[in-house]
């Protein structure tokens, strides 16, 4: 990665960091943006994902500009929302949250939306919205209880981690798999490269 190009990730999510690394992108800095993620009244899940990703990117960008010795950087932010119809599911933090989410998702289709927002060093804002449709099998009570006991769901939108045990719940998936994990790679890489970020430079020195 060129020393002239810095990438700041406005998220502390280990999953997003790992996904970027999977694409050969190593953020120069992790700067989580703490914002109020409460949906607005009657806000559509798509709109929520876009709004929160924008607010995260803008907050991180503004914070960077106040720092002494600020170096112009690309700022990348994302937010993932899971919804059944227009009903937005929470990022599960309690056992009840997780059990309620899984009960609602059991045997049904839902959608996973990710808003991606990129602010260039010059302050230009670019955004993408990615949607994935997912259908879960019918989950018996015992399976829900076992999954909740695993703790894997904690902090996850919709109360599950598709890259873990919950991968066995998926009957059908239409769209980006990495979107469900937390960051749609194809769209993220396209957004960065479209604004001149040298995505492939680090690939040249990557070891097999």
Swiss-Prot record:
Gene3D superfamilies: 3.90.950.10. Its EC number is 3.6.1.9. It catalyses: dTTP + H2O = dTMP + diphosphate + H(+); UTP + H2O = UMP + diphosphate + H(+). Its cofactor is a divalent metal cation. The active site is at residue 79. Nucleoside triphosphate pyrophosphatase that hydrolyzes dTTP and UTP. May have a dual role in cell division arrest and in preventing the incorporation of modified nucleotides into cellular nucleic acids. This is dTTP/UTP pyrophosphatase. The record marks 15, 80, 163 as: Important for substrate specificity. InterPro entries: ITPase-like_fam, Maf-like. The keyword Zinc does not apply. The keyword Cytoplasm applies. NCBIfam families: maf (TIGR00172), PRK01441.1 (NF002401).
